[in-house]
């Protein structure tokens, strides 16, 4: 057996970032990611096309566990579900006063 590794240390990704940095980046973007209908082709092995009809991904376990990546409804991995990214509503002052009278007619 080899030497014991410290599993509490941050594990870097291939690009050099850590899991904590990646999670912080997701929060900074203010985007909401939802996984919609399952697109897994259950009849691919026989040359057909059949989907199971699952309409939205529901995690079967708590966040951070392996079960969180499996859908409770259809049993498929999260990657089979269509990914939908929604940008959070930007805060803006929508009260514009355009009645300055300098526009063309």
UniProtKB/Swiss-Prot annotation:
Assembly behavior: Homo- and heterodimers.
Q: What does this protein do?
A: Inhibits zinc finger homeodomain (ZHD) transcription factors, by interacting with them to prevent both their nuclear localization and their DNA-binding properties.
Gene Ontology MF annotations: DNA-binding transcription factor activity; transcription cis-regulatory region binding; zinc ion binding
Taxonomic classification = Eukaryota, Viridiplantae, Streptophyta, Embryophyta, Tracheophyta
Q: Which Pfam families match?
A: ZF-HD_dimer
Per the record, which residues fall in region Disordered?
1-29
Zn finger regions (ZF-HD dimerization-type) covering which residues? 35-84
What would be the name of the gene that encodes this protein?
Answer: MIF2
The lineage's top-level taxon is: Eukaryota
This protein is called what? Mini zinc finger protein 2
Query: What parts of the sequence cross the membrane?
Result: none
Q: Where in the cell is it found?
A: Cytoplasm
- Keyword Mitochondrion assigned to the entry: answer is no
Name its species.
Oryza sativa subsp. indica (Rice)
What biological processes does GO assign it? regulation of developmental process
Q: GO cellular-component terms in the record?
A: cytoplasm; nucleus
- Keyword Disulfide bond found: no
């Amino acid at each position: 057996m080899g030497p014991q590794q410290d599993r509490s240390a941050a594990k870097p990704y291939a690009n050099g970032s850590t899991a904590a940095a990646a999670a912080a980046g997701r929060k900074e973007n203010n985007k909401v990611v939802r996984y919609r209908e399952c697109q897994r082709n259950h009849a691919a092995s026989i040359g057909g096309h059949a989907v199971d009809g699952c309409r939205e991904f529901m995690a079967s376990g708590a966040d951070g566990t392996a079960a969180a990546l499996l859908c409770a409804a259809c049993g498929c991995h999260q990657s089979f579900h269509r990914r939908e990214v929604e940008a959070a509503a930007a805060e803006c002052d929508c009260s514009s006063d355009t009645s300055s009278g300098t526009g063309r007619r």
